[in-house]
Amino acid sequence: MSKKRVYELARELGIDNKELISRLEKLGIAVKSHSGTLEDSEVDRVTKEFHARGSREMVEQRIKTTVIRRRAVRVPEKEAVLEKVPVEMEKEMGKALPEEVPEKIAPSRETPPAKVVKPRPVVPEKKIPAAGEKPLAPPEKPAEPVAPPIAEILKQEKIQPPEKFAEEPLKKPAVIEPEKAAAAPKAVPGEAKPLPRTERVQEQGKPVPGRKEGRTPVSRRPAETRFPAKPAPQPEMARKQVVAAAPGRAVPQEKGAPKTEAEKPRKKIKLPDETRKGEQIPARKKTVLKKGPEKTDFRGTLEEEIIERAVRPPRWKEEKKAAPVKMKKTEITVPKAIKRRIRVGEAITVGDLAKKMGVKAGEVINKLMRMGLMATINQSIDFDAASLIATEFEYQVEPAGMEYDESMFKVESSVENLKPRAPVVTIMGHVDHGKTSLLDAIRKTRVTEGEAGGITQAIGAYRVNLKGREIVFLDTPGHEAFTAMRARGAQVTDIVVLVVAADDGVMDQTVEAINHSKIAGVPIIVAINKIDKPEADPGRIKQALTEYELVPEEWGGDTIFSEVSAKQKIGIEELLELILLQADVLELKADPDRPARGVVIEARLDRGRGPVATVLIQEGTLHEGDAFVSKTEYGRVRAMNDDQGRRIKEAGPATPVEVIGFSRVPQASAEFNAVEDEKKARSIGDYWMRKEREKELSATSKITLEQLYEKMKEGVKELNVILRADVQGSLEALSDALTKLSTDDIKLKVIHGSTGAITETDVMLASASNAIIIGFNVRPDARVAEIAEAEGVDIKLYDIIYNVIADVRAAMEGLLEPEYREVVLGRAEVRDLFRVPKVGTVAGSFVIDGKVTRKANVKLVRDGVVVFDGKIGSLKRFKDDVKEVLSGFECGIGIEGFNDLRMGDMIEAYINEKVERKL
């Protein structure tokens, strides 16, 4: 049994492989692909089912698309008429067409007319019969037909129909309306397979059925031209006619075949009675062909029609030539004015800005470069730069609205809820003037004895009870490195106690503390300390402070002065009374019922408890379990301790408290606010974190072309440092102090700084960035020390800030290139010249002062002008080579590479001495 592949059967049926596979699956025939094989029984089953359902599906599909429907309308009528016309002609003329003609006509390869059923041109090798009909025997010669030449077709002069056809009384079918043309197939028996292309016959001026109004139909041929000059293809009409009359061919449809849905007429069309009889069809076809002279679109006689089809191009090619598709240029859509506004925060990346404006990032970068600003697609630019760039693209930039602001935490308290609170007093002054000792005397403690170097290096908050009243003291460092701490203390305090040593006088940090207090608008009480010393002179101190507008009350001013001795406990009670008196004048009050608000005084990372911060509550009451936010950090109060280390449940206004529960170590001087829940706290913290990140990106990426060139030209060296400190305030002080050591030749860069112990991450970062690690009041564990030694990372540990600054300064000086200084050794006068073969000119010289050495450099000076700078080639005394010649002796001096010596020249001997540079 022969087998047939799926694609072969699909080609015979004129449908796609996918469609045939789908039909096979519906019939229960399993195939894997288009190259699968089918048995003969399966082939018969598929073909029967195809012809039983194919026409119905084709009609349903043709109704959906008008162009396809027009093709289907003319197929049955054309084929039926072409089948009958040769038979009538054979009877009249007594001569049948040659049998060889259909064998020589090539089938037309044209676009299939439908999607559901795609008919294929008549293939001579095999004809698929209709459903319920036995297949006829194939022709003896199944070879591929070849189209005959046009000249051979023209020789058949009697192929034109006789005039008798025009005399038959068929008037209605003479002019076929477009609507009636669709119903014409009813008179023709059902056919197994429609031909692929049909000719549209219509009157000029009438629209094609189904075509949209307003579209001009493409003309096939000008009305006045019988034979178009266009080249063309296969003679389709001739093929249809001769194939229909050729003997031995399979007839497309027998009388007994069932009618398909394609042959059913539309309801609004009434066909003439003549169409019910098959014998009337030839006369109708003949009438259609003979009506040509009355219609402007008629093709002429059959012979002319054959010639025209032979030389005319296909309709689809004609349409392409007649109506070429014009490619439209891409139109740039311009948004409306209301949409040409973008919202930008404090910083935005170049890519995000380009996306908001709907332009390419490269165009934005090009604009930035023209402005002299170097930036990549991922770098950030500030709001001003973004505004300038957006203006270039005709966009308006609006600042993005703040989601959160400090003002949202400000709550107006009613006067009834305000209650008196304790004053906050900050002790300020120069280093080693006795600030902490004075506070120890007040608190009756010994804090000074436990401080490294006897100096305060962190801000502290304490609460003192005096005669039933409380005073909160803030102790600030006096060292020059702790300027930020002193400024922070002045901003949160009510009263400043300025401590000045009676034996030392007004110093730099004393003046700085005065300025901080004036900026904060805080009243100042001057405490003259160390009056117990013999060299103490309080009057001199008062006189010096008048230069800074601090005039004692006894001198007619408004500044309170108090003389104390912290070591001898002299004048402590009087000082406290003056503080309370000043507090009464200020009438300090706060609302304890509102949500807590305060400021972070100090923060550190505790190994066992995590981030810990000293917070001074200014308003409201903070309870254990409250959610809070401090700028970028947030959390929930897990525990609170007072200044004595005791656990407390709540803290009211003017209370220093140690808070545990931060997400990270907060920034010193940051605001502290209690919120409704932790979710809101997290949202606010994340928002401020994004804002800080935008600022950092904007600051790091903002570099102009000029700055880039200068930086490359300078070749500045950098010393990278990683800082670790016990508390946040000390970390800030260290960072500021070290950064100030930078010069034009060497820069110190703090690449990372945090609180807590030195970790492995710090060591790996230092190794990658070639940095040193400085630990202040912290130490690494054994494991970290081993890793640092293996990586070659230098870890420096300190507990006094003086030593940190001194060592870092020395390290920076070691990176500086040394300077070279000329040191003149002596001078010699040329008094005679000697010409020595193979050596050159030797100057007979007399050493005037100093000495001339063999390895020294020399300068030849003539008339006060340096003529040559080089080295001594030879130094002789008489005939002996010597290392040096002292003043008052004669010698012979030869200079390397120079012989133009003259009498009276001066020879200066010198050396370049290396001098280490200092910062």
Curated annotation (Swiss-Prot):
Residues 172-193 have a biased composition (Low complexity). Residues 420-589 form the tr-type G domain. Residues 529-532 are annotated as: G4. InterPro entries: EF-G-like_DII, IF2_II, IF2_N, P-loop_NTPase, Small_GTP-bd, T_Tr_GTP-bd_dom, TF_IF2_bacterial-like, TIF_IF2. GO terms for molecular function: GTP binding; GTPase activity; translation initiation factor activity. Residues 454-458 are annotated as: G2. GTP binds at residues 429-436, 475-479, 529-532. Pfam families: EF-G_D2, GTP_EFTU, IF-2, IF2_N. Keywords: Cytoplasm, GTP-binding, Initiation factor, Nucleotide-binding, Protein biosynthesis. Residues 136-145 have a biased composition (Pro residues). Residues 429-436 are annotated as: G1. It is found in: Cytoplasm. Residues 93-145, 158-279 are annotated as: Disordered. NCBIfam families: IF-2 (TIGR00487), small_GTP (TIGR00231). Belongs to the TRAFAC class translation factor GTPase superfamily. Classic translation factor GTPase family. IF-2 subfamily. One of the essential components for the initiation of protein synthesis. Protects formylmethionyl-tRNA from spontaneous hydrolysis and promotes its binding to the 30S ribosomal subunits. Also involved in the hydrolysis of GTP during the formation of the 70S ribosomal complex. PANTHER family: TR-TYPE G DOMAIN-CONTAINING PROTEIN (PTHR43381:SF5), TRANSLATION INITIATION FACTOR IF-2-RELATED (PTHR43381). This is Translation initiation factor IF-2. It comes from Syntrophus aciditrophicus (strain SB). The gene is infB.
